[in-house]
Amino acid sequence: MTPALYRVRQPFFWRNTISLFVIGSIPLAAYWYTFTKMTEDEFSDIPIPPISDEELTKLKKEYEAGKQ
């Protein structure tokens, strides 16, 4: 880059850098909030529906057939 181009861009450098951090912090804050809430969540209170042995063997066969 030429020295003239550096001089033209100089007034905007710090404003653009600050804008980058402000705009970039919004999705990072959303990801951080989501991650902390998901790690705190306790799934032990959700009941697991019972499954019969016949249905379990059927599902295992379907799974094994899908792997091959």
Curated annotation (Swiss-Prot):
It is a single-pass membrane protein. One of its GO terms (cellular component) is mitochondrial inner membrane. It is found in: Mitochondrion inner membrane. It comes from the Eukaryota. Residues 1-11 are mitochondrial matrix. The keyword 4Fe-4S does not apply. InterPro entries: Coa3, Coa3_cc. Its main location: mitochondrion. The chain crosses the membrane at residues 12-34. The keyword Hydrolase does not apply. Residues 35-68 are mitochondrial intermembrane. Required for assembly of cytochrome c oxidase (complex IV). Belongs to the COA3 family. This is Cytochrome c oxidase assembly factor 3, mitochondrial. It comes from Lodderomyces elongisporus (strain ATCC 11503 / CBS 2605 / JCM 1781 / NBRC 1676 / NRRL YB-4239) (Yeast). The lineage of its organism: Eukaryota, Fungi, Dikarya, Ascomycota, Saccharomycotina. The gene is COA3.
